[in-house]
Amino acid sequence: MAKDVITGRKTSFGNKRSHALNASRRSWKPNLQKVRILVDGKPKRVWVSARALKSGKVTRV
């Protein structure tokens, strides 16, 4: 399972509820993008969430 290397966001799980409140399992996936960033001074291709990219927590190479 892919995981954001900056914020640690990954797929989360919970219940989908019908109108009658029956529960079935579902998952929420973060919007992960594979981008090149500097890791320890070297460019590396890693998974980063779109939220981290938009907020400026990471800059592309």
Swiss-Prot record:
Chain segments carrying region Disordered: 1-26
Residue pairs linked by disulfide bridges in the UniProt entry: none
Gene3D superfamilies, sorted: Ribosomal protein L28/L24
GO molecular function, one term: structural constituent of ribosome
Keyword entries, A-Z: Ribonucleoprotein, Ribosomal protein
Keyword set includes Ribosomal protein: yes
Family indicated by similarity: Belongs to the bacterial ribosomal protein bL28 family.
Name under which the protein is recorded: Large ribosomal subunit protein bL28
Native source species: Latilactobacillus sakei subsp. sakei (strain 23K)
Lineage, broadest ranks: Bacteria, Bacillati, Bacillota, Bacilli, Lactobacillales
